[in-house]
Design a protein with these regions (language model features):
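Short amphipathic alpha-helical segments
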Residues: 113-116, 158
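N-terminal targeting/trafficking signals and adjacent low-complexity tails
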Residues: 165-173
Length: 173
């Protein structure tokens, strides 16, 4: 679930950390659900006060989820819960230590199928370009990132699944 609240000027705002003060409203992270809440004025009904929904709310949600995911990915990397590059991810997947993966959105179909071939049930988030993933790993471009089964990676996996659901309409994997 993702949380929304409203500012003192009565604008609906996306609460990417889920910790902003005030009355909040939790919504399923699918784009269609958020759009439905906007269209049917569910925010005003839930907050028990008239609120304004910004025209770019969907963009704010996507940007906020991306920002939060990349931030948590950086923390997981510093905590040693991340491997990258196809061979390293494949090894982690095969020995059971990887429980989640990121795949570049702009990867070729062949590159996307390589990892799926080994573990079809592995959850994958394909919401970032190879350059965005590369920047997080200190490289120019990265196609595959594996998230290891560690306690520190749990918030990252939860946020990445929300982002994937919001961007793709369904969880992949």
């Amino acid at each position: 679930m993702i949380r929304f609240t409203y500012a003192p000027n009565h604008d609906v705002i996306f609460d990417e950390t889920g910790k902003l003060p005030g009355r909040g409203m939790w919504v399923h992270p699918a784009r269609e659900t958020v759009q439905y809440a906007v269209t049917k004025r569910v925010f005003s009904k839930s907050f028990h006060t008239p609120v304004k929904t910004p025209a770019d709310l969907m963009d704010q949600v996507e940007a906020g989820l991306k920002r939060r995911t990349l931030s948590l990915l950086g923390l997981a990397r510093k905590g040693g819960a991340v491997v990258f590059g196809f061979e390293a991810v494949k090894k982690a997947v095969m020995d059971g230590s990887a429980v989640f993966a990121f795949e570049a959105l702009d990867a070729s179909e062949r590159e996307q199928d390589k990892l799926y071939h080994y573990v079809p049930e592995l959850p994958v988030c394909a919401c970032f370009t190879r350059e965005e993933l590369g920047r997080m790993m200190g490289q120019t471009a990265v196609v595959h990132i594996g998230i290891l089964n560690q306690k520190a990676a749990e918030p990252l996996i939860a946020t990445a699944k929300k982002l994937n659901l919001f961007m793709q309409g369904k969880e992949k994997g």
